[in-house]
Amino acid sequence: MSGMFYECSSLKELVISNFNTNNVTDMGEMFYGCSSLKELNISNFNTNNVTAMELMFYGCSSLKELNLSNFNTNNVTNMEYMFSGCTDQFKNKIRAEYKNIKEEAFNE
């Protein structure tokens, strides 16, 4: 799923509740550059096997709502710059809501 929606800068909404992510290991750059995306619910994603989430939401500067409530990040070894390019207000909200996100995810 790496780079699946890469640079889809006109994408404003996305319904991906039926995605089967059971065998996915790489979600890096998945929503990279989706600068018009405002909210995203990916709580249904099975992330048990994911090891890479670097740059996943890089440049998602319009993102205000993100549901990661069921994310299992135990096997993730790379979260670098996951939220780089997002607003500080959004990053602070994610930090407060999800304690399992490593600090490297918020690097600029």
What are the residue ranges of the model-derived segments?
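Negatively charged
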Residues: S2-E108
